[in-house]
């Protein structure tokens, strides 16, 4: 029988109704793994983002493999599915969102040097192919995660966590 450690928090540090959403929307373009989609839901809930947009072939709830890694976050994070990511990106741009692609393009700025203009929409692509050229071209900025190892590669859901928490840190510093 497994028991919780006595020092582990079982409730949120801040009441949910007191949390203002982080002005970030994430668009997942053609993310193949439903486990990665579920991980994005869970991290999106932890960072209290505005919305998750699931585009192209990206799977969407209800699906058991999403639920397995989301642990219920698919019920708490606002989300939508679209087959037309370009139209959603255009609507976000009209609403004054900065559109930032997480890519390793030659023009990408380092995540730690990037000064985002909130609100921001972050674009993540397929696990091995990245964003389609058409979607990548719609970004105002390309941002890369600095990597020191030889692979120069992170799992897309892991990359999402890295980027979201750097954005959370930057946003909180702006509010201080």
Enumerate the predicted regions with their spans.
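Post-transcriptional modification and biogenesis factors for structured RNAs
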Residues: 1-176
